[in-house]
Amino acid sequence: ALMQLQARGFVEVRTRKGWYVVEPSIDEARDAFAARRAVEAGMLRDSSLLRDAGKPLQAVIKRLRQHIKDEQAAIAGTDIATRTFLLADFHVCLAECLGHRVLCGLLRDLTARTTLVASLYQSTHDARASCADHARIVSALAEQDVESAAQQMLVHIGDVESALGKSAAAVDPRERLRASLAPLVR
């Protein structure tokens, strides 16, 4: 499993030191966000996916709305890992609901790359904003307005990228380490 993660660029092995999770640079995160914008907006604009998903649209909307409820519960709680996972998994769930299995795998990789950055820098406020964006995207899909859904997705990904960039610039690396270890020190 670690070899597969290494091949995908998520972990690295250091001789005589062990395995480490790769911390993507801001430039690598920007590349992943650019790819996500192209893929996700294109996926939403392909309205044939809504017609050919093999599921009634209402079932798709119901599943996506349940996912958003799960996101809201995680945001209200204290489990940052679950919150971060669910916010990223919305995009994979969306591709899955629209019947696009190939994009599910691609989005898992892309969201994993951006999730690494988000877990370092995303605030609870940013998480709430992302969840609200997801709800707006689903509302546009419920109205069968794929162009609006695609535009909402572009704005959402841009907002997340922008917020992470500002947070990354404002956080001292030592302070970030201190904050991440704070739950362990009592």
Task: Give the ranges of each region predicted by the language model.
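Short linear motifs at protein or domain termini
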Residues: 1-49, 165-186
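C-terminal regulatory/effector modules of DNA-binding transcriptional regulators
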Residues: 123-186
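Alpha-solenoid helical repeat scaffolds
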Residues: 42, 116-117, 162
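Short alpha-helical functional segments enriched in proximate histidine and acidic residues
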Residues: 46, 93, 97, 163
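Conserved amphipathic alpha-helical segments that form helical-bundle/coiled-coil interaction surfaces
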Residues: 27, 32, 36, 54-119, ...
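Mobile beta-alpha loop/short-helix "lid" or hinge segments that flank ligand
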Residues: 7, 11-12, 110-112, 126-127
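Short helix-capping/hinge motifs at transmembrane helix termini and TM-loop junctions
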Residues: 48-49, 99, 123-124
